[in-house]
Amino acid sequence: MNRCRVAVDTPAHSGLGNTLDYESEQPLAAGTLVRVPLGRRDVPGIVWPDAEAAKTPLAEDPEALEAFALKPVAEVLGSLPPLPPAWCRLVEFAARYYQRSVGEVALSVLPPELRKLDDAGLAKRMRLQDKRAAKAGPVAAEPPPEPPPLTAEQTTVLAALESAAPACHLLHGVTGSGKTEVYLRLAEAALTSGKQALVLVPEINLTPQLEARFAARFPGRRLVSLHSALTPAQRLANWLAAHRGQAELVLGTRLAIFCPLPR
């Protein structure tokens, strides 16, 4: 048996700590979604990165096992790829900043529909999603439109972003000054290098407009959106497409910052 540490949705003031220990028959990768017993019910949880816990098998001695008194993981949602380490680090930062438990933040930023599903239900959703994608066929790869020539300011900004280490940069300008074109060029660079691109929208009403502009600029690229106006099923489908690497472009409001992107 192996010990794993699981983040569950418990308040920071509950006294339970950031993670709870459970036992599993097989080692579980960090970021794996599970269901674990908590009190009288099974709740969703996430196996949390902990190098020492992952390396420590429970003693085979029955007396030692009894001393640990760990409950077993109820179910492993093995159909879903584990959440990436970068996502876990982002959640840990948010938990520290807002003084919340890791599980409280981690579970709250997952799609509500995902938290309700067991592994069989999740696998079924993913099969249906794959069938719909196969039935629709590949997106017609039309030639992308010719981008407008860059202004001197845009050229300077892009050159600075390409040469600098990853950091926060502020683009300031009135409407129509060319900020969106900079975002489009940065997204193009990410897509060309085989990465996914996440574009955050300041308010939900701007999502359709920006989505149409990105779709026109990148024909043949799969684009999904994430915001609170989507139905629970739509939000889960788009989240899965992003997490599984199927969606290349993700547009969304601030909730999309917690969307895991493998590339």
Region spans (language model):
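Accessory, non-ATPase domains that flank or precede helicase/AAA+ motor cores in DNA-metabolism machines
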Residues: 1-263
